[in-house]
């Protein structure tokens, strides 16, 4: 029997993808032996896939104001924000509302 896996989908929209190598969708397979919360996921993203200007995405241990986070099309504020525990096949969407002009 293999190591348990947690498969999720990350999506980036409205400019957020520019901070992640211009990739709008990523399918991730995470270590299923670990409890994965949004807080843990953000740390993993910072260490592994955030390629440009982290200060535009993260502020301390959370996303910056102006970055909307939807988990399975539901605002993360309704689901516990950083404490939300990721489930198999979750879709986590990051939308930037920060636009130059």
From Swiss-Prot:
The keyword tRNA processing applies. The keyword Cytoplasm applies. Pathway: tRNA modification; 5-methoxycarbonylmethyl-2-thiouridine-tRNA biosynthesis. It is found in: Cytoplasm. The modification 1-thioglycine is found at residue 101. One of its GO terms (biological process) is tRNA wobble uridine modification. Disulfide bonds: none annotated. Keywords: Cytoplasm, Isopeptide bond, tRNA processing, Ubl conjugation pathway. InterPro entries: Beta-grasp_dom_sf, Mopterin_synth/thiamin_S_b, Urm1. C-terminal thiocarboxylation occurs in 2 steps, it is first acyl-adenylated (-COAMP) via the hesA/moeB/thiF part of the MOCS3 homolog, then thiocarboxylated (-COSH) via the rhodanese domain of the MOCS3 homolog. Its main location: cytoplasm. One of its GO terms (cellular component) is cytosol. Gene3D superfamilies: 3.10.20.30. Coiled coil: none annotated. There is a cross-link at residue 101 (Glycyl lysine isopeptide (Gly-Lys) (interchain with K-? in acceptor proteins)). It holds the Pfam family Urm1. Belongs to the URM1 family. Acts as a sulfur carrier required for 2-thiolation of mcm(5)S(2)U at tRNA wobble positions of cytosolic tRNA(Lys), tRNA(Glu) and tRNA(Gln). Serves as sulfur donor in tRNA 2-thiolation reaction by being thiocarboxylated (-COSH) at its C-terminus by MOCS3. The sulfur is then transferred to tRNA to form 2-thiolation of mcm(5)S(2)U. Also acts as a ubiquitin-like protein (UBL) that is covalently conjugated via an isopeptide bond to lysine residues of target proteins such as Prx2/Jafrac1, Ciao1, Eip71CD and GILT1. Interacts with cer. This is Ubiquitin-related modifier 1 homolog. The lineage of its organism: Eukaryota, Metazoa, Ecdysozoa, Arthropoda, Hexapoda. The gene is Urm1.
